[in-house]
């Protein structure tokens, strides 16, 4: 079996997979990413990282990748043109019904690999509900943008505050899908003064203020893409694929 993608397998081939085969479930989003990145940035980045990982591990029989569920819950970007979003309740219910068709079969081990920060809490609920019903299942929840090691490439400040169309994602797109980046639109970006103030209540504080993207920046960008480059994107991609490999190695032992 040289394909790693569920969609490219036959029903007989899937039936022959080991119950210990790790099922990678990609979650992304279609939402605005400012004027310099396409609306499918989250999907492109995750697909390309997974493609690279599969190429590096083509002979492995440890995992199979489900289709990327790319219509996510992106209500924080609803006021911007191009965003496609499902409300939280319907999104969780759809994902639950969709994944039951895999969980209800023989498979036991899953990696929820997510590229959209706005649905982290949704996937927490999803994993909790599935684990409650399928007690023997092992579920990893992994947000690729939170993997360790990126601080060797991107500044701590930009990693903390630049998570939507900033240096991190723009560098990845310059490496993974260079032709889709509107380079003439890349410019210095400033955040709302309320974003990182010294008060105890805030967008990123322990006591959180709920926000929509326009509360932080009218451009739709959170972060500063000005220092992005393809070399940084390559290094980030390598860290991501290496981390996925380590996750699979550890999950195999559970």
Question: What residues fall within each predicted segment?
Answer:
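Extended, histidine- and acidic-residue-enriched regions that form the cofactor-binding/catalytic faces
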Residues: 1-109, 117-254
